[in-house]
């Protein structure tokens, strides 16, 4: 139903900017590009084209499942190990609740760590051979990011590579069809042995990993992805079509078409109860 959407943003809920923001800016290389008065700010890695919108939800914000995380790419396996050791050293300084052990998972060599806002984050590396299986495993950047930003850390975050979603284990194939046929996103060819699937837009290398789960913890709209389509006219038409056919394609919630600061958008909740924002250029 959506035609050639572009994945332009991820959205991320934390408890306090004061606690979470230093993790992003000092450990992951993110930069704040916009600040809003409604409890959100927009960050971007200089080497990556999409943004991450951070929502400050207060002390009651829940811990998010591990498989609702975002991941950053480094340039070597040794950098993954070095990053892990560095984060262990600064764990108390940044109030990191945990720093995991590097391991191989879904072809990536990576580790997870927690941040004080209730979320998990990943640092990963893919061997060059992996890029032969899928382009998403190759570098997402045109040139390496400047090392001085990470001086003394032993690693350099080259870019924000992916986000993640969950779906019900029993609904994996219907959800794949929804992503492709309704949201208009591409399904990345992957080795058949992987239990997950990847979705992305037609224009950019970053992607979203969908992880089937037996037990789910459903999140609110502060944890969502933003898809941008061609025009406001196309946005109105898409909203009308979803309103007419939403039950047929198993949409669980459809928000009103809104305009805010000259920007038009609407929210929808998909069959897996994940949230999306659909918008158009101003």
Whereabouts are the PLM-identified features?
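Broad, structure-driven detector of short, well-ordered beta-strand segments within folded domains
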Residues: 50-54, 121-123, 206-210, 276-278
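Vicinal oxygen chelate
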Residues: 6-15, 44, 61-156, 240-282, ...
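Core segments of cupin and vicinal oxygen chelate
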Residues: 2, 11-56, 164-207
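N-terminal beta-strand motif that seeds the catalytic metal site of vicinal oxygen chelate
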Residues: 1-21, 70, 129-176, 225, ...
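Conserved donor-binding loop and adjoining core beta-sheet/short helix segment
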Residues: 54-61, 211-215
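Residues that act as N-cap/strand-start positions at coil-to-secondary-structure junctions
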Residues: 37, 105-107, 193, 221, ...
